[in-house]
A protein has these predicted regions:
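Helix-start/capping segments and mature chain N-termini
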Residues: 1-19, 23-31, 36, 42, ...
Length: 167
C-alpha cells in the first residue's frame, strides 16, 4: 500500500481509503490459498484534452489472478535477451508503477521464443535500466547491485525487500 500511496501523491491523485481497499482485497482473495491481486487506481472520468474533473472521483479496479506456478527459471538464472526498444526517461514518473508502460510492451513484442524469459532494456544513453517486467539485481560477493531508478524504471516491492536484506 505504501507504493500505491507514493504513486498517488506523485500523480496528484487522492489517496485511497486503505482500510476499505484492504477489506476489499481480503474479500476478493477469500477461499484462495495463494493469489495475486492487482489494484488499479485511476483519476476517474476525464474531460477532453486530459483535463481532470473537479472534484476528482477516482475509480478503483481490483483484479484477482492465479499465483504463478514455479518454473525452472524461478531458480535462476533467467535466459535473457537485449531489447532494441529503449526506455523513455522521465524523472517525474520514475520509480512508480503507472499504466504508461508502452516502452515495455514494445520491447516484449520483439520476441516470441519461449526459451527467453526476459528482455533487458537500456536507457537512451545505453545504460542498463531494467527488464521488460522486472527489476535487475546482480549479486557480487555480499553486495547487491541494481541500476539507478532516478530517471526510469519501477522501484519494485521485491527489489526493495532484497536491498533492505542486503544492508
Amino acid at each position: 500500500m505504501a507504493h500505491l500511496a507514493d504513486g498517488c501523491r506523485r500523480l496528484r491523485l487522492p489517496q485511497p481509503d486503505v482500510a476499505l481497499l484492504t477489506n476489499e482485497c481480503l474479500a476478493l482473495a477469500a477461499g484462495h490459498a495463494r493469489a495475486v491481486i492487482k489494484i488499479y487506481w485511476t483519476a476517474g472520468d476525464s474531460k477532453r484534452g486530459y483535463r481532470r474533473p473537479t472534484p476528482l472521483r477516482p475509480h478503483r479496479i481490483l483484479r484477482l489472478g492465479a499465483w504463478p506456478p514455479a518454473t525452472d527459471s524461478d531458480r535462476g538464472p533467467w535466459p535473457l535477451r537485449l531489447c532494441d526498444q529503449r526506455m523513455s526517461e522521465n524523472p517525474s514518473l520514475a520509480q512508480i508503477k503507472h499504466l504508461n508502460r508502452l516502452d515495455q510492451v514494445l520491447a516484449r513484442s520483439e520476441w516470441s521464443n519461449a526459451d527467453v524469459d526476459e528482455g533487458v532494456m537500456l536507457g537512451q544513453d545505453g545504460r542498463v535500466l531494467c527488464g521488460t517486467m522486472s527489476n535487475l539485481l546482480i549479486q557480487r560477493g555480499d553486495s547487491l547491485i541494481t541500476p539507478s531508478l532516478e530517471s526510469a524504471g519501477i522501484a519494485g516491492v521485491v527489489r526493495g525487500l532484497l536491498l533492505q536484506l542486503g544492508e
